[in-house]
Amino acid sequence: MAFIHLDIRCLYTLLICTAFGSTLSSNAEIKVNPPQDFEIVDPGYLGYLYLQWQPPLSLDNFKECTVEYELKYRNIDSASWKTIITKNLHYKDGFDLNKGVEAKIHTILLGQCTNGSEVQSSWSEATYWISPQGNQETKIQDMDCVYYNWQYLLCSWKPGMGVHSDTNYNLFYWYEGLDHALQCDDYIKANRKNIGCTFPYLESSDYKDFYICVNGSSESQFIRPSYFIFQLQNIVKPLPPDYLSLTVKNSEEINLKWSIPKGPIPAKCFIYEIEFTEDDTTWVTTTVENEIYITRTSSGSHQLCFLVRSKVNIYCSDDGIWSEWSDEQCWKGDTWKETLIFSLTPFAFVSLLVLLIACLLSYKQKNLLKTIFHTEKEGFSNQEIHG
């Protein structure tokens, strides 16, 4: 009987090992192919590219599995990859076309057909380059774009170094919502050459990538194009605040107030920088309100002045451009005394002059009376002698 029990235990052990081994063997045999026809497509949107692919071969064998794709992409020479996991057969994103683009993708299987484990295919890779034309020096220089008051976009640039006199540049732009890239139709010119662009009203262009390409033409050389990506809300330059007021509440507290800049920017989107001067001391502070209370360092200070400038804050953009400074608003201490002194000085001068003239006239009048008196006295004396 002991031998029979031993044989049964051995049989159970053998069956378990066989089942476990078959499971390992089945998992080891599960393989999936990478996606087919992986490519990077440029639709002509100045940097907004399509990454697209087709399902892998022999996918019918894995109907009980979830099929996903892990996509990695970046500009060449970038330090890190962007990673996306999707069930779709395409993905879209923006790239800097001044550099090349590289991407890779593989298939991921999850579910019953893999006994709960994850199976990955090998990588499929793709790259994209715009064929470089012209020397690097022919590209425009010092590209600068400002979205004035969240209403008017203006871009300006300088010509490339060493370009021939017949070289001229053209600007194209695109953002999501436009059917195709558009060329600037209002160039800023200098010596009949394009050095900037004033854009028309840009409908629904906020909080989107705004793509710009500035290329050039010349009969004597190729011109290297330049590509840029902006977020317009991050390059807004507001108007400066106006209607500043400075009120001294008491010997210590000062109230500074100004109006919200005019235009479409909501009041909640502003941050203000205040430059405050008390006699010869100047300091700077910021606030998100259009009013601030500060304390005088000395109750005997004679002059208080301040200026304000505005910028879009972090609640409405990632960055921004400070406005110009407002006009200065000042308060001067003991102004009534100064006013009194200034008003009394001319009066005192005139009064003194009148007094001097009166004294002079009085003096002359006295002398005249004396002369008349002495003359009459002498005449009277002579009459008595002859009488």
Q: For each predicted feature, which ranges?
A:
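N-terminal Sec-dependent signal peptide, specifically the hydrophobic helical h-region
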Residues: 1-37, 65, 70-76, 101-104
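Cytosolic C-terminal tails of single-pass type I membrane
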Residues: 355-387
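Beta-strand-rich modules
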Residues: 2-11, 17, 76, 90-120, ...
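Short beta-strand segments within Ig-like beta-sandwich modules, predominantly Fibronectin type-III
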Residues: 80-89, 184-193, 283-291, 322
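Extracellular fibronectin type III
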Residues: 22-30, 109-136, 218-238, 313-341
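Single-pass type I membrane protein transmembrane segment
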Residues: 338-361
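Conserved aromatic anchor
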Residues: 47-63, 151-163, 246-247, 252-267
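Extracellular juxtamembrane "stalk/ectodomain stem" immediately N-terminal to a transmembrane helix
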Residues: 228-229, 233, 246, 251-253, ...
